[in-house]
Regions:
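Short, surface-exposed linear patches
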Residues: 19, 48, 87-93
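Exposed beta-strand-loop-beta-strand "reactive/processing" segments of non-cytosolic proteins
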Residues: 46-87
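Short, non-transmembrane alpha-helical segments in secretory-pathway proteins
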Residues: 19-54
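Sec-dependent signal peptide recognition
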Residues: 1-7
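C-terminal partner/receptor-binding element of secreted or periplasmic proteins
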Residues: 28, 91-96
Length: 96
């Protein structure tokens, strides 16, 4: 009975869920690069507002990720800065 339960659970797990893990790791690495290079500046801009920087990512390919840094308040997310991140060369630059 337990084997049947485990088999049915494994059957319904989408195979795409495993493929997205690599993409999530790349996006997390890109966000960490932005935080490492620009995090203190963003925190200083928000000092006294009781807000913290929040990050969103857009995966382009295994090397390039776009990152938006902003704030989330009362159901609204507002972007402060956009970054172009090259994970392969560990570089992050502000987008113009």
């Amino acid at each position: 009975m337990i084997r049947l339960l485990i088999a049915s659970i494994l059957f319904f797990i989408p195979l795409g869920g495993f493929a997205d893990e690599k993409q999530r790791e790349i996006e997390n690495e890109a966000i960490n690069l932005v935080i490492k290079k620009y995090g203190k500046g963003l925190e200083n801009r928000l000092k006294g507002t009781e807000l913290n920087p929040n990050y969103r990512s857009w995966y382009e390919n295994d090397c390039f990720v776009s990152i938006a840094a902003g704030t989330f308040q009362e159901g609204t997310w507002s972007a402060m800065e956009w970054y172009s991140v090259n994970v392969c060369s560990s570089s992050a630059e502000i987008m113009d």
